[in-house]
């Protein structure tokens, strides 16, 4: 009875072994089945571990299990079924074979022990060292645990903190920018109010001065109302009382704007406060529309040898053009009209800013229309042997060329070689032996434009005789504060004065060298004359000596003859 039961158990185990072989992968791995004694020992160990505390027991049992099954990569049969092994074998395509030893261990007598399928058994898989992975797919270390979750939580917290810090920094930067903008706006408003107060004060002073001048001159300007019935009556308007006479506050102030005319009430010539006759400044006149040349054109270019320094000034379309009369007046104060001569070239936009300003009568103003008038003079004047071209004559006449202010439009024209007006034509025809000074003046955003930098760089590189007087940072006419305003006119005058002194010094050295050469040449000529005189003197002396010798010989002969005669008489 026992033998039949053992045989049936063996047959059953054999069938299970065959099914296991057919279902497992074909990798040849030695497999051994643990005995019941070993299994009971492991179960006993696990039961001992379960008696400890829940957390400590769990960690220790996990570590024990890892120590038991990690070295030989073993697993418990109760953790998986043969059906799972079969599914895994179908998925595995490596072609390995697994051999399972299902024979029962033998006793010392040679009899096999009975195998009980009800008891849990373990299968050990032994993998070669080459095919071992760093971590088995059933290893506990690969499974996500609390430590990994804590790390992810820490990373999320760090990211949130960084985002909060970045937001705080952005808010602080915005607040600083807003404060800076407010400060700049306050400064601009303060300067505008100061400027307005200064202008009002100057207007008040100008009106008071005008009233004093009108009372001293005995001018009596009255107002007449226009009657509706008479059409031939004319109105005389007292312009100072009706309009404000604005004044520009500058050092050496002598510039006044023409009062604004009322469209409905024209101003008579008597009421004009800026006429040449009523002006308190001598040798100055108001700039008006061109009325043709005051003197023939040739008068300005036949004086190249007048022993004066010739300064040519160009003004372009910038509001800084109103400072040109200040520059001219200061140069005349330094040198005087006897030592320098100044001529001014203005463009069409520059005329708009110069209109109504007072200019010295020693200055000749050239406009764009004068070039065509110059051609008419060439046609009418038959005495000229050659046709004179205005921009050629200006280039020959000038010893230095100052363009102040230089607008962005004219700067672009000069950089690209455009010559569509008198000023640009003179510059295109300029000689590299004569220095040129340019003072740019424009809005801040026009000055920081990349094209402005490109134009200035090309001018300096292509024309080494050009010196750029860089603009300064100031409150512009539009109210903005920034770089782009023309250099201070006093600085421009000082730079021009230095260049004039340098040119004069170089000329004096050249003239000194020429005079020294002439003196040396004259000395050499004098030495030659002295040598010739010495030779003539020597010849004269020789002739005198010869004559003296002949005379002495003749006297001696006469004395001898007289002696002989005396001897004969005695005998």
From Swiss-Prot:
InterPro entries: Flavin_trans-like, Flavoprotein. It is found in: Cytoplasm. It holds the Pfam family Flavoprotein. Residues 8-35, 60-72 have a biased composition (Polar residues). Residues 516-571 have a biased composition (Acidic residues). One of its GO terms (cellular component) is phosphopantothenoylcysteine decarboxylase complex. The modification Phosphoserine is found at residues 42, 116, 121, 124, 264. One of its GO terms (biological process) is coenzyme A biosynthetic process. GO terms for molecular function: catalytic activity; FMN binding; identical protein binding. The keyword Glycoprotein does not apply. Coiled coil: none annotated. Its main location: cytoplasm. Present with 2940 molecules/cell in log phase SD medium. Component of the phosphopantothenoylcysteine decarboxylase (PPCDC) complex, a heterotrimer composed of CAB3, HAL3 and VHS3. Component of the phosphopantothenoylcysteine decarboxylase (PPCDC) involved in the coenzyme A synthesis. Belongs to the HFCD (homooligomeric flavin containing Cys decarboxylase) superfamily. This is Coenzyme A biosynthesis protein 3. The lineage of its organism: Eukaryota, Fungi, Dikarya, Ascomycota, Saccharomycotina.
């Amino acid at each position: 009875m026992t033998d039949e039961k053992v045989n049936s158990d063996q047959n059953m185990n054999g069938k299970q072994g065959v099914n296991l072989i057919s279902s497992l992968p074909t990798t040849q791995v030695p497999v051994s089945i643990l005995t019941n004694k070993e299994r009971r020992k492991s179960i006993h160990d696990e039961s001992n571990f379960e008696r400890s505390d829940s957390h400590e027991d769990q960690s220790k049992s996990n570590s024990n299990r890892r120590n038991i099954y990690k070295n030989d990569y073993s697993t418990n049969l109760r953790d998986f079924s043969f059906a799972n092994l079969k599914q895994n074998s179908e998925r595995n395509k490596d072609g390995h074979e697994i051999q399972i030893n299902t024979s029962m261990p033998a006793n010392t007598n040679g009899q096999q022990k009975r195998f009980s399928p009800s008891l849990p058994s373990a299968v050990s898989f032994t993998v070669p060292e080459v095919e071992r992975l760093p971590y088995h797919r059933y290893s506990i270390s690969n499974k996500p645990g609390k430590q990994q979750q804590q790390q992810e939580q820490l990373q999320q917290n760090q990211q949130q903190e960084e985002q909060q810090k970045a937001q705080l920094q952005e808010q602080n930067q915005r607040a600083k920018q807003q404060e800076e903008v407010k400060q700049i706006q306050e400064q601009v408003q303060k300067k505008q109010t100061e400027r307005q107060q200064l202008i009002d004060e100057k207007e008040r002073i100008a009106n008071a001065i005008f009233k004093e001048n009108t009372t001293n001159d005995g001018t009596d300007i009255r107002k007449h109302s226009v009657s509706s019935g008479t059409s031939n009556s004319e109105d005389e308007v007292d312009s100072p009382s009706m309009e404000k006479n604005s004044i520009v506050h500058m050092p050496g102030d002598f510039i006044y704007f023409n009062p604004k005319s009322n469209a409905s009430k024209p101003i008579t010539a008597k009421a004009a406060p800026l006429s040449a006759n009523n002006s308190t400044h001598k040798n100055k006149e108001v700039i008006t529309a061109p009325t043709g040349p005051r003197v023939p054109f040739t008068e300005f270019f036949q004086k190249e040898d007048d022993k004066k320094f010739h300064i040519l000034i160009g003004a372009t379309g910038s509001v800084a053009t109103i400072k040109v009369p200040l520059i001219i007046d200061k140069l005349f104060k330094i040198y005087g009209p006897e030592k320098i001569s100044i001529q001014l070239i203005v463009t069409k936009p520059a005329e708009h800013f110069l209109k109504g300003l007072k200019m010295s009568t020693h200055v000749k103003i050239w406009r764009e229309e004068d070039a065509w008038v110059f051609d008419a003079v060439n046609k009418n004047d038959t005495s000229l042997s050659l046709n004179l071209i205005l921009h050629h004559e200006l280039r020959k006449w000038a010893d230095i060329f100052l363009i102040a202010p230089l607008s962005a439009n004219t700067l672009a024209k000069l950089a690209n070689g455009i010559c569509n007006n008198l000023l640009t034509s003179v510059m295109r025809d300029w000689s590299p032996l004569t220095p040129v000074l340019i003072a740019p003046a424009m809005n801040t955003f026009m000055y920081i434009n990349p094209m402005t930098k490109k134009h200035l760089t090309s001018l300096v590189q292509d024309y080494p005789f050009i010196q750029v007087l860089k603009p300064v940072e100031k409150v512009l006419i539009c109210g903005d504060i920034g770089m782009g305003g023309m250099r201070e006119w006093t600085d421009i005058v000082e730079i021009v004065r230095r260049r004039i002194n340098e040119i004069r010094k170089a000329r004096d050295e050249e003239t000194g060298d020429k005079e020294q050469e002439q003196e040396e040449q004259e000395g050499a000529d004098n030495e030659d004359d002295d040598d010739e005189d010495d030779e003539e003197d020597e010849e004269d002396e020789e002739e005198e000596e010869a004559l003296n010798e002949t005379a002495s010989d003749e006297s001696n002969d006469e004395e001898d003859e007289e002696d002989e005669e005396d001897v004969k008489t005695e005998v």
